[in-house]
Every structure is written in C-alpha cells, then in structure tokens.
C-alpha cells in the first residue's frame, strides 16, 4: 500500500515539475494593408498580445474576389472570429478569421513577407471613388473620426492626422495616417515601430 502511495506521489510530482510554462504573450504577423497581387503594402512586421487573445486575418472581398487583407493582433471587442459582414456597398464584404498560435495568421505566399519599397511619386490606387473612400472605412466599423464633407472638399483648419484623404490614390504618408486611425479604433493592436517616421510624398 505504501509503495502504491509513493508511486502516486512521484507521478504527481513528475507531472507538476514537467509542465512547460505557457508564454504570457502571443506573436502575430502584422500587415495594415495587403494586396494579394502585390503583397504587403504597409506594415510587414509583427505585433504581440496577451496569450489569451488571438491572431486575426480580416479578408476584404469585392464580390467574390479577395481585394485587401489586414493581418494583426485581434481583440475581442472588435471583429468576431468567423464573422462575415457586408459593408454599405453591396459589392464589398469581409470575413474575420482567428487563430491561437504564434504567427498563425501567415502570409499568402513567401514572397509577400517583405514590404514594398516606398516610391516618392506613385500613389496606391484603390478601386473606390472619391466619395466612397470615407464610407468604405466607416462601413468596416473602424470608428474613424471623419468629418462631414461637402462637394468633395475638405474644410479648412482640420488636423491632417484626423482626416482621410478623399483622393482616389492614397500615398504612403496617408497610409501612415490610416495606421494611426486603426491603432486608436480598437480594431487591431498594432506595433509602433517603423511606421510613423515622416516620409516625403
């Protein structure tokens, strides 16, 4: 009887000592804007969150074609895992997917792991009209502090960091402003390094 008790105690001690500590943080791929045909346009870094949170991929579709992808560290207060949602425009909809391992929200293919060089004279063209740009990002529930625009003009005296450009093409400087909006909206936990340095446009 004593031998069985001793063996039981040793087994319990072995299980206790042999447990591998669970990391307190999870590391995910981060890309603020990814075009499947080009790669990661802005971001191409990593972000970290608590191990109880999940990595997330938000795929934005135009009809049935993948148009943009956002990768980052998801928060429960934002998009729900496996959620599909339409935007205000019937052609655009998105799906949110989550996973629970380090770097599980991987790139579409190996060549997409590095960001593109930032050109000085070529803007990023989006398939949206001037009037749709502000509504599209609002439709994605990003809680952007956008003012009311009249006749396609921007009121004087507004801080450029709290407005989105209504031009058809977005420069990389404007993508950085969009990054700030996303970072404050609760959509994703985004890294600070490497994205906020001013760049001439």
UniProtKB/Swiss-Prot annotation:
Residues 26-118 form the UPAR/Ly6 domain. Keywords: Disulfide bond, Glycoprotein, Secreted, Signal. This is Lymphocyte antigen 6 complex locus protein G5b. It holds the Pfam family UPAR_LY6. InterPro entries: LY6_UPA_recep-like, LY6G5B, Snake_toxin-like_sf. The gene is LY6G5B. Disulfide bonds join 28-55, 31-40, 47-73, 81-98, 99-104. Forms oligomer. The keyword Signal applies. PANTHER family: LYMPHOCYTE ANTIGEN 6 COMPLEX LOCUS PROTEIN G5B (PTHR14313:SF2). CDD domains: TFP_LU_ECD_Ly6G5b (cd23544). One of its GO terms (molecular function) is identical protein binding. N-glycosylated. Residues 1-18 form the signal peptide. The lineage of its organism: Eukaryota, Metazoa, Chordata, Craniata, Vertebrata. Glycans are attached at residues 141, 183. GO terms for cellular component: external side of plasma membrane; extracellular region; protein-containing complex. It comes from Homo sapiens.
